[in-house]
Structure formats: structure tokens, C-alpha cells
A protein has these predicted regions:
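Glycine-rich phosphate/adenosyl-contacting loop at the front of the ribokinase-like
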Residues: 1-64, 69-73, 248-249
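Rossmann-fold NAD(P)-dependent oxidoreductase module
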Residues: 51, 77, 265
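Short acidic/glycine-enriched loop/turn segments that link adjacent beta-strands
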Residues: 92-95
Length: 307
């Protein structure tokens, strides 16, 4: 590890993704035939860890490996990335899901839960937390009714760790009291348009994100899709970071790729704006490839060109 790099603790799940392409999203009592696009290991945390590893950022692995077919594949892919397995479940396999995708990139997910809800104090205590660095977690874990120990563990994490939280579509299920208890001075929230509306209020994304940052004290990264992202920090003018235009294959894992790229930049000591720009670049590459596993290596990032 380079001395200038700070470690990133990645906490969450690895899931099996079976990606299907359908002509339109399904309705009751209808029959459709789907095209199988791929079978991949995904999951928010694993997607973030994969992006970090490919960009050679130091990762502390807080992702469960299950006991089953998907668990074997997760362990193999972790080994290929150079990630040491730290959490194993003795009986349950990893979660897996169908990702059903329309030609325009819109998709729905059907998930089969696995070992990813076993966040007990004794297991969390085995994750080696650095005194300085970053700690990533997603809303899929934070919203789980069994995740009380996990939420408290995050709140009790070392003061030198910046929490980078991507609530995702489970934001609606996360206890507002937990969000209010977060240490605002060291918490960064990454949200897409829908999540900004849910957390900050309906209306113009930038206006609402800026207001929330000023009133609540959080730093927000408001991801606005093909337009790029806004950085909203308390009592500061928002900063716009434009997107990179590419031919889109699908949007699976785009938000995870953005978080991974941004965290890689922060780990290297980049300014927040430059780190968000790196997140935009990594996300652009991922959406130009099928599925969520297209995070670039350093060489691929250097060779990246836009349309």
C-alpha cells in the first residue's frame, strides 16, 4: 500500500446476478420470453470493492462469503481481485437475484435472500477497522430489520473514518432516527435523483439537495444520471461535475461504479471534486458494458475515450 493512500472498508453483500433482457417490464398473467445476458457476481458492496481493486486502491474486505454455489464463485472472484476473505457463513449461500432489463436500460430486480443479514456484533468485531480512511455501506444492509448491530457499529466507528453511504432504493426502509444519529462531520451521502426526492423533498434535485445539506450538515453527492453529479456541502456553493458521454449498454451497477471510483480518488488524496469526476468516468465505462462487472483497470481508465 502506498503511504499516500488511505484504506477503504467495504461492508455489505456479494450477490449472484442473473441478467435477463425482456422487451418490456412484466405484467400480471402475461407470458414473455427473455434473453439471458450474463451470470455475474454483483451486489452493491462487491461492485464497489471490484472497482476499488481494479484501480489498485487498498480495500478492507467486509463482504460475506456464503456456503453454496454462489459462495464458491464469490470466493473465487475475491481471490482473483486479491481480496482476503474475512467473513464466512457456515450454512447459508450468498443472495442472488434476477435483473430484468428493458432495451432502454430500465430494470427491475427479484432477489432471493441469503447470508447477507448475519451482521452480529461478534462478526463485525472481526473486521479490522483502520484509524483513518473510509467506510462504505449500502442501504440494502442498513435497512435490514436484523441490522441493529450493524447500524450501531457504524455509529461507533473510529472518528478518523469517513462514512460513505449509498442508501439506494432501500432508503424508504431505513429508520430516520439512524440517519439523524449519523456523525454529519464525517458522513458523505451518495444519492440519485429519486433518493434525493425521498430524503430531501420533492422538487428540483439541486435545490433540495443544497437545502438539505445546509440544514442537516451532511455532504451530499447528488447523481443526476447522464447529466453528471452535484456536490452539495453545508454552507457552500454547490459544485457541478459533468458526466462523460458514452453509448450505454445498460445501467446495472452504475451507482456502485460511481461510489467505487469516487472512493478510489478519495483514497489517493484527491479533492472531492476530482474524486467525483473519477466516479463519473468509472460509471461511464461500466454503463458502456453489459452488467455490473465492467469496472475498469487503471490502464483501461487511461485509455478511456468518450463518444
Amino acid at each position: 500500500m502506498k503511504e499516500s493512500q488511505r484504506p477503504v472498508v467495504v461492508l455489505g453483500s456479494a450477490t449472484g446476478d442473473i441478467v435477463l433482457r425482456v422487451p418490456e417490464l412484466l405484467h400480471e398473467s402475461e407470458y414473455w420470453e427473455a434473453e439471458e445476458i450474463d451470470r455475474q457476481v454483483g451486489g452493491c458492496a462487491f461492485n464497489v470493492a471490484r472497482a476499488l481493486c481494479r484501480l489498485q486502491a487498498p480495500v478492507v474486505n467486509g463482504i460475506f462469503v456464503g456456503n453454496g454455489t454462489w459462495g464458491e464463485r464469490v470466493a473465487t472472484e475475491m481471490e482473483q481481485l486479491g481480496l482476503q476473505v474475512t467473513l464466512r457463513h457456515p450454512t447459508k449461500d450468498n443472495s442472488w437475484c434476477f435483473a430484468m432489463m428493458k432495451p432502454d436500460g430500465k430494470r427491475i430486480y427479484v432477489s432471493v435472500p441469503g447470508c447477507d443479514d448475519a451482521w452480529h456484533q461478534d462478526r463485525l468485531a472481526t473486521i479490522p477497522l483502520p484509524g483513518q480512511g473510509y467506510l462504505y455501506a449500502s442501504g440494502y444492509e442498513l435497512a435490514n430489520v436484523k441490522a441493529g448491530d450493524l447500524r450501531q457499529w457504524l455509529l461507533d466507528s473510529p472518528a478518523g473514518l469517513t462514512l460513505v453511504l449509498d442508501f439506494g432504493p432501500r432508503l424508504i426502509d431505513i429508520d430516520p432516527a439512524f440517519i439523524q444519529a449519523l456523525p454529519v462531520e464525517r458522513t458523505l451521502l451518495s444519492l440519485n435523483k429519486d433518493e434525493v426526492a425521498l430524503l430531501c423533498g420533492a422538487g428540483d434535485t439541486l435545490i433540495q439537495a443544497r437545502r438539505y445539506a445546509n440544514e442537516q450538515g451532511f455532504t451530499l453527492i447528488a447523481r443526476v444520471g447522464a447529466e453528471g453529479a452535484w456536490i452539495c456541502q453545508p454552507n457552500r456553493e454547490p459544485e457541478y461535475v459533468p458526466a462523460y458521454m458514452v453509448k450505454m449498454e445498460d445501467r446495472i451497477g452504475a451507482g456502485d461504479a460511481h461510489c467505487g471510483g469516487m472512493l478510489a480518488g478519495l483514497s489517493q488524496g484527491m479533492s472531492l471534486r476530482d474524486a467525483v469526476d473519477l466516479g463519473n468516468r468509472v460509471a461511464a465505462i461500466v454503463v458502456s458494458r453489459p452488467g455490473a462487472n465492467g469496472a475498469p483497470t487503471k490502464d483501461e481508465l487511461t485509455d478511456f475515450s468518450v463518444d
